[in-house]
């Protein structure tokens, strides 16, 4: 090694309490730019410490049979620790940010990654971060849409890729009550449609968000385009609404 390389390696080894071999390897990654290498080292060590703390948080709620999984009972305990009732819509927000694959289930790696993304390392910090996100959720349309889209696979039963319409209605009432002016008409339509006995297609679920935005500026659906790319079920709803809902609301 060149003299300057030797001195850099020696200095880095001393500063980071690592072997000369490890110091040399790390410096090489950053072309022997000491400041960059040291900054990256500190960042990595900070992340490793944060991951360790969050793994400990996860372990408080993990299953005895599978330490990398939080199941329903553990999820109840987690929500309780976060001061969130199981009936609260906030459970969906927590599930979204902690990357739950389905209701009442969290996986260690995804949980830790999600908590890190919230800049938290402890349960108390996580509780505060969630409270802050709840406030954002109430007014941030992009976050509202993201959680809405995320909820469809979250609410599906394990091993299933589709959501029953009856269950979908329950989530519509939670997620769209303040954003979809025709929610009551939509639910009334679903209950008399053959779809009530079937699964609601995912694309219909997703497109309903955009439709809810559309009707805010066109509550009578006067400019609705039946030749557009809307799902068939929404076409059928608009026809139903013009015959039943709009007629009733204008009388």
Curated annotation (Swiss-Prot):
InterPro entries: DCN-prot, DCN1-like_PONY, PONY_dom
Keywords from the named record: Ubl conjugation pathway
Keyword Kinase among record annotations: no
Stretches assigned to the DCUN1 domain: 49-242
An annotated GO BP: protein neddylation
Molecular function via GO: cullin family protein binding; ubiquitin conjugating enzyme binding; ubiquitin-like protein binding
Physiological role: May contribute to neddylation of cullin components of SCF-type E3 ubiquitin ligase complexes. Neddylation of cullins play an essential role in the regulation of SCF-type complexes activity.
Protein name as catalogued: Defective in cullin neddylation protein 1
């Amino acid at each position: 090694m060149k003299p300057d390389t030797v001195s850099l390696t020696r200095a880095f080894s001393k500063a980071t309490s690592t072997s000369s071999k490890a110091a040399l390897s790390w410096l090489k990654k950053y072309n022997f730019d000491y400041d960059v290498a040291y900054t990256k080292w500190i960042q990595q060590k900070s992340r490793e410490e944060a991951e360790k703390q969050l793994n400990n948080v996860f372990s408080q709620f993990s299953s005895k049979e599978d330490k990398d999984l939080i199941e329903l009972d553990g999820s109840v305990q987690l929500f309780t620790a976060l001061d969130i009732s199981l009936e609260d819509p906030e459970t969906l927000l927590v599930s979204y940010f902690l990357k739950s694959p389905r209701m009442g289930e969290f996986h260690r790696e995804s949980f830790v990654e999600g908590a890190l993304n919230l800049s938290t390392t402890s349960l108390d910090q996580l509780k505060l971060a969630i409270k802050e996100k709840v406030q954002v959720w109430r007014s941030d349309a992009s976050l509202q849409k993201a959680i809405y889209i995320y909820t469809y696979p979250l609410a599906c039963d394990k091993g299933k890729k589709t959501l029953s319409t009856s269950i979908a209605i329950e989530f519509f009432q939670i997620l769209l009550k303040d954003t979809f002016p025709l929610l009551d008409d939509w639910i009334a339509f679903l209950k008399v449609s053959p779809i009530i006995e079937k699964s609601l297609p995912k694309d219909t679920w997703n497109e309903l968000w955009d439709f809810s935005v559309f009707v805010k500026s066109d509550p009578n659906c006067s400019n609705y385009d039946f030749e557009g790319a809307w799902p068939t079920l929404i076409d059928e709803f608009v026809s139903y609404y013009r015959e039943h809902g709009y007629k009733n609301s204008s009388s």
